[in-house]
Amino acid sequence: MGLGAALVAILPLIGVVATALGDGQADIALSDLSRYALTSVALSAQVAVLTAVLGVTAAWLVVGHDFPGRRWLSWALALPLAAPAFALAYGYADLFDAAGDLRIWMRGTLGVDMPFEMRSLGGAGLILSLAFYPYVYLAMRAALLNQSSQAIEAARMLGASPARAFFQVALPMARPALAAGVALAVMETLADYGAVQFLGVQTLTPGVVRAWFVFGSVEAAARIALPLLAFAAVLMWIERMGRSGADHDSGRGRWRPLTLQPLPPVKAALATGFCLMLVGLGLVLPLGWMAHTMIDITPEWPRLIAAARHSVGLAVIAALVTVALAALLALGSTRHPLAARIASLGYATPGAVMAIGLLIPAAVLWRLVPGSVGGFGMGIALLIYAYAARLMAAAFEPIEAGLTRVTPSVVQASRMLGRSETGTAWAIQLPLARGALFTAALVVFVDVMKELPATLMLRPFNVDTLAVMADNYARDERLANAGWPTLLLVLLALPAVLWLTRKISTSRPGEP
């Protein structure tokens, strides 16, 4: 069962490699490929540094210190995950436009201007860091909560200041979690299409999409995708090593929770202000500006409602299919541990690369299935396949954690009473892990709602999601119009993200 589920994730990647190494003509110059790759590396480096600084600082503040608002900020700091990165790009590019009212006021009144343009490599790095720092924050928060206070207390007794105790004791012990969180942020950076394409930054993922849409060349797109696959494999390895290292380190010795250190009034105000700044810059300011600009715009209600229906429908179906496959993977992971590692490569792979891997078999299938109805159904099936292949590993993690909490003796008793392995899974293991299944479904739902490149490349004709609708408006520089589908997307995803972040913030150390 597990191997079959893993094959679902790996087959599109095999298709990409086979297409890239085939004999077909590929209209891609080495200089273009090098430029895409170097820009991707430079952008990833910026995001890695900024997300590490922001995520580590926020995690250490909420885990180790007491200040006003700490309890609700501990989950609010993860809320930027509800917004796709392109939403932040639209908001900040419009707010800080060179000809906009804010920049004109800054130059005329304050005599200063922005040190860089938002539509640049530096601007993209800042925006993506604000969008993806929660990956580092959540990983570091979990790692710090799992640390015992004994080591830090020993350092303090030896005369170390709080800052020195953190940098020399707590942070080194949390390095595996830091590596895992940064790796996830960089994965999302490499996979991003909507934000970097809108900001005019030429990375590998927009190059893949452009090779298909502009040149109609699957071979060129596949060859651009090869470096992305290599980056994905390295990042997934770093993330897995970081995760296993964090799990290993957190279980050492006798555990005692960290003691919250009260901060003096000025430092407490700075801590609250820093956390509020992250939530504001990562969610409230860009979306608030978009809401302000769209007030006078009457939305195209029929298109907007249809796009919302498509988004929710695809996300629900994809969540059900992906959770089913991830459950098979988790149930078989004991006998086939390699299957989970194979499937994890799909999560590190950008949606555009998944789409390229499915385009050639899709072309064959579309010729075999006559009529528009068959083509429509095939397009939806390919979309669901791409979503499931990419997000199976994301659903696998909470399901595996839920299954490990099922008492082995209960499973053994079921088998001794004559139930088959499948019967035991249906009657015992999966019902007891229903909370983990629900969590996994929400994770997939949110990611599918925000997915853009795979949807853009594989969707049937006239099937627009909210993300695609927003992208179409943004391409025409109609950012006020793009606000409606963008904010509706965030509102639909926000309840799921709120539930997930509250669950994470209230979990005890050692719990998934």
Each PLM stretch: what is its role?
Residues 1-23, 31-145, 173-193, 221-240, ...:
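Membrane-water interface segments at the C-terminal ends of transmembrane alpha-helices
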Residues 65-69, 145-150, 160-163, 214-218, ...:
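Juxtamembrane helix-boundary/capping and inter-helix hinge elements in multi-pass membrane proteins
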Residues 148-151, 245-255, 327-337, 408:
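Cytoplasmic membrane-interface regions of multi-pass membrane proteins
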Residues 157, 503-512:
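Short, charged juxtamembrane terminal tails flanking transmembrane helices
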Residues 190-216, 450-479, 512:
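Glycine-rich helix-loop "coupling/hinge" segments at transmembrane-helix boundaries
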